[in-house]
Amino acid sequence: MTMIPDTELVLVVAADENNVIGLDGGVPWHYPEDVRQYKNRIAGHPIILGRRTFESMKPIPDCYTVVLTSDDRRSADSETVEYATTPQIAVEAAARAGASGAFAGDSAGADSSPPVTYVIGGEAVYDLFLPFAGRVFLSRIHEHNEGDRYFPDLGAEWTELSREPHDGFDVIEYEQASPRPLDDL
């Protein structure tokens, strides 16, 4: 078994009151303030996302992007995009980018905590990585929408750390006291 380099997985998601995160390849709401805080949060950090989510978005500047895909014929689109066919390879690639300092965000050298890797969707990727994440930043959209993609319920092991109210949504930070070790991926 390979040892995965040290990194903290943090999920970032926007979900409505029913945990809807998507509809027909997009999101059924538009909050520019939420998009700004999201981009500011992940800027300079490595990110992991699924192929369909990657294809539905514009490239995110200042982020090392690891795309989780089952297509082993994919190759890097640029110096900042890498494809991975397993969760282990995805985390290893993101951790390498974070450890290099080039994509370590504000946590680089700030203290002894490991570099942060953000997991930004979609549904299957959230389901896969949630047990291994130490934190979740959830933009809770105060709407009830139709959807075809959902964020999983956070169980009793998750504790709310903070809540920032905004017009139409709250940004809530949750912490999981004992995430599963990344080597169990």
UniProtKB/Swiss-Prot annotation:
This is Dihydrofolate reductase 1. InterPro entries: DHFR, DHFR-like_dom_sf, DHFR_CS, DHFR_dom. SUPFAM superfamilies: Dihydrofolate reductase-like. It is an enzyme of class 1 (oxidoreductase). Disulfide bonds: none annotated. GO terms for molecular function: dihydrofolate reductase activity; NADP binding. One of its GO terms (biological process) is dihydrofolate metabolic process. It catalyses: (6S)-5,6,7,8-tetrahydrofolate + NADP(+) = 7,8-dihydrofolate + NADPH + H(+). Pathway: Cofactor biosynthesis; tetrahydrofolate biosynthesis; 5,6,7,8-tetrahydrofolate from 7,8-dihydrofolate: step 1/1. Residues 8-185 form the DHFR domain. The gene is folA1. PROSITE patterns: DHFR_1, DHFR_2. Key enzyme in folate metabolism. Catalyzes an essential reaction for de novo glycine and purine synthesis, and for DNA precursor synthesis. Belongs to the dihydrofolate reductase family. The lineage of its organism: Archaea, Methanobacteriati, Methanobacteriota, Stenosarchaea group, Halobacteria. Pfam families: DHFR_1. Its EC number is 1.5.1.3. One of its GO terms (cellular component) is cytosol. Keywords: NADP, One-carbon metabolism, Oxidoreductase.
